[in-house]
Each structure stands twice: as C-alpha cells, then as structure tokens.
Amino acid sequence: MSETHLSTQRFADLPLHPEVKQALAENGFEFCTPIQALSLPVLLQSKDIAGQAQTGTGKTMAFLVATFNHLLSTPVPEGRLINQPRAIIMAPTRELAIQIAKDAILLAKHTHLKVGIVYGGESYDVQRKVLDQGVDILIGTTGRIIDYVRQGIIGLNSIQAVVLDEADRMFDLGFIKDIRFLFRRMPEANQRLNMLFSATLSMKVQELAYDHMNEPVKVEIAPEEKTSKNIKEEIFYPSQEEKMRLLLTLIEEDWPEKAIVFSNTKHSCETLWSWLEGDGHRVGLLTGDVPQKKRIRILEQFTSGQLDILVATDVAARGLHISDVSHVYNYDLPDDCEDYVHRIGRTGRAGNKGMSISFACEEYALNLPAIESYINHSIPVSNYDSEALLADIPTPAKIHRKHPSGTRNLRDRSGTSRPGAQRSGARPPRHDRTRRHS
C-alpha cells in the first residue's frame, strides 16, 4: 500500500485488544488509512458511526477491527445459545461477503472467535453445518441469513455488533426490507455497536441509520473528485465492426499485468471471453450465470495472478477489492453514470497508477454526455488507425471450453508458439501508439 494513502495514526497506538494488535502486525498493518483513523477512535468508545467511504479506502478493516475489539472487550450475553452469533455483518453481494470473511479470518487467528459465512448459490446444508457448530461473527447476504433465521437455525437475540456494508448498494438491489426484518429481531440499538458504511450518505441511507442505530456519528472520507487523479482516462470512438479488433489490439500493445474488461450484458461478456481466450490470453468470465463455486475460483485465480484478464458485468464493479488492477476497459459505456465511476475505480487504488480505456460505439455513445456531466470533466479522446488493427486474429474459443491452467501462450502472430516465454518477457507491441506518450 502506498504511503501516501495512509495516515500518521498507528494501529499500535490505539487502545485495541492485544490479540487484535498481534493479528494486525502479523499481516503488515502498521498505519491506518484515513477512514480507519477517523472511525476507529469513535468506535473504540462504543459509539455508532455512519461512514461515507468508497471501496478500497480500508473501510472493511475498520469495521472488522472494531467488531473484533468489541467482542473481545465485552462479556458474552448471559444465556446466549450456541446458535446465536454475537456479531452480524451484512453485505449486498456474495463476492463482497467472501472478501470480508477472508479479512475476518486473518483477525481471528489469535482469538477464540469463530467466523461463519452464508450466502445464496452455495450448498444450504454445508453452510448449516457450520452454523450448527456455533459462530461468533456471522457474515453474509441478507437473503440467506433470513432463510436461516426463519427456520430457527440462527437467532439474533445475542447480537452485540452490527455492520451494514455498501448500504447504498443495498437500496439499489432492493434489500432494505430484508435489512429492516433482521434489525427488528436484534436487541435494541443502544445494546449493540452499530456500523454503517456507504459510498454516499443519501437521505434514504441516513434515514436507515437513524431508524436502527443509536445516534450515529457521521464520518466522511469523500473524494473531492468522483474519479481518482491516479487513473488516466481515455475514450475511443470505434465502429461496432471494429470494436473487438480495437480491444484485442490495445491489449496486445498494453499487455496489462491485470485487467478487467466490462460489458453491459452477459451475452457480450461471453463473446468477449471467447475472443480473448481464442487469442491466447489467460482470461476469466464473471457474470450472473457463472456457478458460485466457479465464480469464487475465478476471482481467486485473478487475484493470485493465474489469470491476467477478467471479463465481467457490473456484478464485479462494486464491493470487490482486487489489488494491483492496472487497466480497466469499458467495452460498453455503462447506462448508469455511477457504474462508470465504480468500474474504473477498480484501478488506481491505494496510491497506484491506473488506466481506464472506454469505447463509445454507435449503441452506447449516447451515454457519454451524462457520464461526463456526472464526473465533472470530459474524457480525453484518443484516435486510432483502422489499418493498424490486428487482422490475423485466431478463431474465438467455445464458451464451454475450460480455462487453461498453464502459462499464457505467448505465440507470435505467424502462429508459431514460444512455450518457454514467461509473463514478464512478453513480446513488445507490434504497433506504435505515440498517443500514449503525447
């Protein structure tokens, strides 16, 4: 993490439980991010907060540290049953819940606290077996949590800490009734530590906070600009016929270390995956139709570097913290202005530089004025030479084909392979793009 992304507040100087401090130190957490530096002193006084912070600012570790510290410093409720968690963390998506759980497990290492995760799309019985053994911190999506509550598999009578992450996204997805259902089955707000985080503290989000929290302190880490200065944006105006060739040419020339390609529809994503896979790239596909186990595996492969490119719908645009994404390609301009910000926000994180390349084709160019109005600036236009686009593109792969597990096929354009080539030794660009350096 870049030092410029951190504050001067050390975790070691905060009044944290020794086991929490030990876990933080072992995982390289020395200085707080701004949202952590502002929120933790408030939370460590057992005061509720409504925090405004974007994904990637360190808010997850902020509420996890507060949750663990609160449970370790607070007596277990008298008469608590094994099926009653002490803390509940609600997330809008499965992917975000999984990411939160991974971070929670790091903090749990030296404690007696058990972490459990539940979400739809996974085996109901497998998750139930974990719950039957008892969990202290329950992380999950609201729908699956409600299923277990209604069946009496878990009870919320002993909840001492509550986290509502990505609250604005909860509204977007229509989960607010579920959230209120769960809040009504917990102890009163003044008997628990309540934390709400949202990219925007709109009136509806603030109303939710004041309805179900105990006079929350508002903590805001809102960027002055909607898009980071660390992200270099550019936009092309390709025809629909040249869109795919332009994308393949740009990827060929940029050879990004880790890239996400966004498209507006599942069908378009599948087509993109087929062309990229056929062109020899290590690429994963993430849409709503991909089975949950496969989605998890693809995200793990992309995070670990086994895949270089992730093709995704906006299911991956919110809530996922994937470090070191160097490039974001908007193959389609999104219909929602906020989705543009969330998409390109996958890169340029934690003080790192990033590239955002967008295509304004005939179908989606009409979305551009609203996007530029929303982000308060024009996106620089880049031109290209149609005759310089790759012409010898291999046949697209079939969608049911398995992803390769080996290294990327760094063949030359004549079709001869170079199996010994390594990722770091990729061939240089075939075509000059002087606009990059202008």
Swiss-Prot record:
Residue span of motif Q motif: 9-37
Pfam families documented for this protein: DEAD, Helicase_C
Domain Helicase C-terminal per the UniProt entry, residue ranges: 243-390
Residues involved in ATP binding: 53-60
Reactions the enzyme catalyzes: ATP + H2O = ADP + phosphate + H(+)
Protein name (database record): ATP-dependent RNA helicase RhlB
Subunit record text: Component of the RNA degradosome, which is a multiprotein complex involved in RNA processing and mRNA degradation.
Top-level class of the enzyme under EC nomenclature: hydrolase
Entry's family note: Belongs to the DEAD box helicase family. RhlB subfamily.
Gene name tied to this protein: rhlB
Keyword RNA-binding set for record: yes
Role noted for this protein: DEAD-box RNA helicase involved in RNA degradation. Has RNA-dependent ATPase activity and unwinds double-stranded RNA.
An annotated GO BP: RNA catabolic process
Domain Helicase ATP-binding: 40-219
The keyword RNA-binding is annotated on this UniProt entry: yes
Assigned GO CC terms: cytosol
Top-level lineage group: Bacteria
Basic residues biased stretches: 428-438
Motif (DEAD box): 165-168
Keywords: ATP-binding, Cytoplasm, Helicase, Hydrolase, Nucleotide-binding, RNA-binding
Broad class of where this protein is predominantly found: cytoplasm
EC number(s) on file: 3.6.4.13
Location of the protein in the cell: Cytoplasm
Chain positions covered by the region annotation Disordered: 395-438
